[in-house]
C-alpha cells in the first residue's frame, strides 16, 4: 500500500516504450496558434498578454545583452507551467516530479550562464567567489564555500522543483485516500477532509505556478551575474 502512493511518479509505458516524451510534447499543442486575421480572438489575446507579462518580469533585471535569452526563458517557463498544471489532473503523469528531467533542464542552462560570464568578463565572474573586504586568513575558506555554493546551484534548482511537486502530489493522494476511506463510516469527517482536499488542491495550483516562475527567475538572476 505504501509503495502504491509512488506509482504516480513512475513513467507509464505503452508496448514497452515510455510515454514521457509525448507527455512533454502535449502541453505545447494546447497553446492556440495565431490566426491570419488582423484581430486575434480572445484566447490568443490572453495568451499574448500572459507571455508579454512573463517576459517583462524576467527581462527587467537584465541588460540588452541578456535580452537574447528572452525566447528561451519564456518558452521554458511556459513549458514548466503547463506540465506542472496538467500534472494536477487525475490519471496524468507529471514529468517535473522526476529529478533526472529537472537536472537535465537546470544543469545545461546554469552551465551556459557560467560559461558566458567566464568568456565575457572572467575577472568579474571569478570575483564573485570572494566577497569584498574579506580578511586575509579567511580567504581560502570563503573561496571554498563560495565555490561549493556555486556548484550546487543546478542541484538546488532541480531538487527544489522535484521536492515541492512530489510533496504536493503525495499530500493530495493521502488526503483523497483518507476521504474515500472515511466516507462509509464517518461521513461528517469525510466531508471535512474533502474540504481540506479542495483547499490543498488550490494551494497546489499556486505552488505549481510559483515553482515554474522561481525556477526560471533564478536562472535569469544567475544570468544577470555573468553578463
Swiss-Prot record:
GO terms for biological process: proton motive force-driven ATP synthesis; proton motive force-driven mitochondrial ATP synthesis; proton transmembrane transport. CDD domains: ATP-synt_Fo_a_6 (cd00310). It is found in: Mitochondrion inner membrane. It is a multi-pass membrane protein. GO terms for cellular component: mitochondrial inner membrane; proton-transporting ATP synthase complex. The keyword Oxidoreductase does not apply. It catalyses: H(+)(in) = H(+)(out). Pfam families: ATP-synt_A. Its main location: mitochondrion. Keywords: ATP synthesis, CF(0), Hydrogen ion transport, Ion transport, Membrane, Mitochondrion, Mitochondrion inner membrane, Transmembrane, Transmembrane helix, Transport. One of its GO terms (molecular function) is proton channel activity. The chain crosses the membrane at residues 12-32, 69-89, 98-118, 139-159, 170-190, 196-216. It comes from the Eukaryota. Subunit a, of the mitochondrial membrane ATP synthase complex (F(1)F(0) ATP synthase or Complex V) that produces ATP from ADP in the presence of a proton gradient across the membrane which is generated by electron transport complexes of the respiratory chain. ATP synthase complex consist of a soluble F(1) head domain - the catalytic core - and a membrane F(1) domain - the membrane proton channel. These two domains are linked by a central stalk rotating inside the F(1) region and a stationary peripheral stalk. Belongs to the ATPase A chain family. Component of the ATP synthase complex composed at least of ATP5F1A/subunit alpha, ATP5F1B/subunit beta, ATP5MC1/subunit c (homooctomer), MT-ATP6/subunit a, MT-ATP8/subunit 8, ATP5ME/subunit e, ATP5MF/subunit f, ATP5MG/subunit g, ATP5MK/subunit k, ATP5MJ/subunit j, ATP5F1C/subunit gamma, ATP5F1D/subunit delta, ATP5F1E/subunit epsilon, ATP5PF/subunit F6, ATP5PB/subunit b, ATP5PD/subunit d, ATP5PO/subunit OSCP. This is ATP synthase F(0) complex subunit a. It comes from Coturnix japonica.
Amino acid at each position: 500500500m505504501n509503495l502504491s502512493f509512488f506509482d504516480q511518479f513512475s513513467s507509464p509505458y505503452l508496448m514497452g516504450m515510455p510515454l514521457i516524451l509525448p507527455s512533454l510534447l502535449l502541453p505545447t499543442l494546447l497553446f492556440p496558434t495565431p490566426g491570419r486575421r488582423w484581430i486575434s480572438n480572445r484566447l490568443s489575446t490572453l495568451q499574448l498578454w500572459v507571455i508579454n507579462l512573463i517576459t517583462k518580469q524576467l527581462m527587467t533585471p537584465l541588460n540588452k545583452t541578456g535580452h537574447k535569452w528572452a525566447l528561451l526563458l519564456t518558452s521554458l517557463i511556459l513549458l514548466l507551467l503547463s506540465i506542472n498544471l496538467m500534472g494536477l489532473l487525475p490519471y496524468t503523469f507529471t514529468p517535473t516530479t522526476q529529478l533526472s528531467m529537472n537536472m537535465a533542464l537546470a544543469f545545461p542552462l546554469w552551465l551556459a550562464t557560467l560559461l558566458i560570464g567566464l568568456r565575457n568578463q572572467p575577472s568579474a565572474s571569478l570575483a564573485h567567489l570572494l566577497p569584498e573586504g574579506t580578511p586575509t586568513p579567511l580567504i581560502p575558506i570563503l573561496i571554498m564555500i563560495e565555490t561549493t555554493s556555486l556548484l550546487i546551484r543546478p542541484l538546488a534548482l532541480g531538487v527544489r522543483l522535484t521536492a515541492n511537486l512530489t510533496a504536493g502530489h503525495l499530500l493530495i493522494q493521502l488526503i483523497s485516500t483518507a476521504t474515500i476511506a472515511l466516507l462509509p463510516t464517518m461521513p461528517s469527517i469525510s466531508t471535512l477532509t474533502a474540504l481540506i482536499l479542495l483547499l490543498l488542491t488550490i494551494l497546489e495550483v499556486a505552488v505549481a505556478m510559483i515553482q515554474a516562475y522561481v525556477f526560471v527567475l533564478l536562472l535569469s538572476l544567475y544570468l544577470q551575474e555573468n553578463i
